[in-house]
Amino acid sequence: YMNRKDLKIGVLYSTEESSSPIQVANLKEAAKSYPGMEILDSAVADITTIDAKTTELLSRGADCLVNLLDNTVVGKLETNILPLTNEARIPVFGSEIEQVKIGCLASASIDYITVGKSAGAAAAKILAGTPAGDIPVATITDPTVYYNSRVAAELRIAIPAEPGTDVA
């Protein structure tokens, strides 16, 4: 699905979460590496506008939606966003496994155990006297792929052989 040449990716984000506009900017920058990929973003001022903003992205031709690590938007995923996207047969890609379990198509996400080990290693360095500012920011280099075969069947999307772990 994501291998299409022209792909419009919709992304909802909250203006109340300081990291969300940064995540959108990073997504737009990454999309420049893929000719034909376009990011359609829509800022959500508060939770009462989520339905309208989701519908707006769908009417602008979004081929799929991508969730950021945005608690405001994720909090309305199951009750507001997924019913609208499912009706339109538009997949939503989550940012972590729990979102895939509740109805997103797939996610290349963090492994919380790995994150915990990394945080523990950083804490040990700090306790050993390393200033926190001297410890580099950790990034995910090997995400875990999760998918939901039930959602794929409902949306009539073929899943490639062995893409990751099925959580349906």
Write out the residue ranges for each language-model feature.
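Short hydrophobic alpha-helices and adjacent helix-cap/hinge residues
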Residues: 1-168
